[in-house]
Design a protein with these regions (language model features):
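Arg/Lys-rich, low-complexity, intrinsically disordered basic segments
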Residues: 1-158
Length: 158
């Protein structure tokens, strides 16, 4: 599946700039200088367009069945809860749908998932962790333990 190569605003060594996709060149600009910012964005955009024209595609990763199953369990568990106990942000629910449907994910999405798992690993040690807890529901929405293991494995191979 071909995913778009977006131009995004990034920071490198404390300097603002633009980059397309995950592997594009960093084009820095001078803060407060609109002309410099516009040039950097235009250069990154042109590089992305040239890469697309040459047939370049960013790598994608299809979630395995175990991750899809965990996300489906999370969605089902969330649906079975009363409104006051439904977990998951809009982003978490969207991620669960992508995982459950085994949609290809970008490297950037894998990194966001790894960040989620790193931040929320401690939730598992909290009181009340279990099938009815919001933390458990949210963990499953992001793919659960199989998701964490898969994401870490994919990122370590890059």
């Amino acid at each position: 599946m071909r995913l778009p190569l977006p131009v995004s605003r990034v920071t490198q060594n404390g300097r603002p700039g633009y980059r397309w996709g995950e592997s594009g060149t960093f084009y820095g600009y001078t803060p407060g200088n609109e002309a410099s910012r516009a040039r950097a964005e235009a250069r990154a955009t042109r590089q992305g367009q040239a890469a697309r024209a040459a047939g370049y595609e960013e790598p994608t990763f299809t979630p395995p069945a175990s991750v899809a199953a965990a996300a489906r369990r999370g969605l089902a568990l969330r649906e079975a809860q009363p409104p006051s106990n439904k977990a998951g942000t809009a982003v978490g629910i969207a991620r669960a749908r992508d995982l459950a449907n085994r949609r290809p994910l970008s490297v950037d999405t894998l990194r966001r998932m790894a960040s989620y798992f790193a931040r929320h690993e401690v939730d598992k040690e909290g009181e009340g962790w279990g099938i009815d807890s919001k933390g458990y529901q949210a963990w499953l929405l992001w793919g659960g333990d199989p998701g964490r293991a898969w994401v870490n494995r994919q990122l370590s191979n890059l």
